[in-house]
């Protein structure tokens, strides 16, 4: 944009509201935000469909749906009522089933288990007796380490090792619940509409490129970190539900 548009990035350490990003963008406190659509299920259950579904689409299928199968139009219909322009914001690829302090051997082992897991997966596990909670990313390690929760699902090898979960939870389960997880850019609709047309196009193209880049990087880093788990963390036991 030759300096016409600058984007300042604030982490949750500054705004202190990891689960309030939609509200902040809607209110104009931030012109733009980045998160995951399924966090807003308490406001509108339809938002969950734009992130992932258990046994649902993988990333290439999601992008085909968004751009050529009517997904963008459905997302616009849901977010128009919030005054927000929503756009695909990057994909983690298939996610792991979570880190557990104790091994899961039977369905009874889920009863009373305190676990951080969002979206449709949380709804499913709650039916099995799991006490589902949603904790901001910056608090996950401490919560698991102190036993505030018994298990958590975050992303996968691409990001989990950076969080250090392999140091405190010996059981790492493969996933079923998020075959691909699409994140979300949100732009205050009034602010977006006020931009000159060329800046609207630049921002849209930049978001699309960032989404593809995140997907490629996540896919690569998951493979690299998976190999690291086997070599550097022999204490971690890979399990399948």
Task: Describe the role of every protein-language-model region.
Residues 1-62, 72-241:
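N-terminal secretory/targeting leader peptides
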């Amino acid at each position: 944009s030759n300096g016409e548009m600058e984007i300042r990035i604030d982490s949750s350490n500054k705004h202190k509201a990891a689960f309030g990003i939609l509200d902040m963008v809607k209110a104009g406190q931030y012109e733009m935000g980045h998160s995951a659509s399924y966090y807003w299920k308490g406001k509108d259950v339809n938002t969950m469909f734009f992130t992932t579904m258990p046994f649902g689409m993988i990333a290439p299928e999601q992008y085909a749906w968004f751009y050529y199968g009517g997904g963008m139009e459905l997302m616009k219909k849901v977010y128009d009522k919030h005054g927000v322009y929503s756009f695909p914001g990057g994909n983690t690829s298939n996610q792991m089933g979570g880190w557990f302090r104790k091994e899961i051997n039977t369905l009874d082992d889920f009863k009373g288990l305190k676990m951080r897991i969002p979206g449709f997966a949380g709804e499913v596990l709650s039916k099995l007796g799991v006490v589902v909670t949603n904790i901001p990313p910056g608090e996950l390690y401490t919560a698991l380490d102190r036993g505030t929760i018994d298990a958590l699902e975050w992303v996968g090898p691409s990001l989990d090792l950076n969080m250090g979960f392999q140091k405190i939870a010996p059981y790492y389960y493969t996933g079923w619940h998020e075959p691909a997880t699409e994140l979300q850019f949100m732009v205050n609709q009034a602010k977006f509409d006020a931009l000159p047309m060329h800046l609207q196009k630049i921002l849209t193209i930049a978001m699309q490129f960032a989404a593809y880049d995140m997907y490629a990087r996540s896919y690569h880093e998951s493979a690299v970190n998976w190999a690291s788990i086997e070599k550097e963390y022999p204490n971690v036991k890979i399990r399948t539900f």
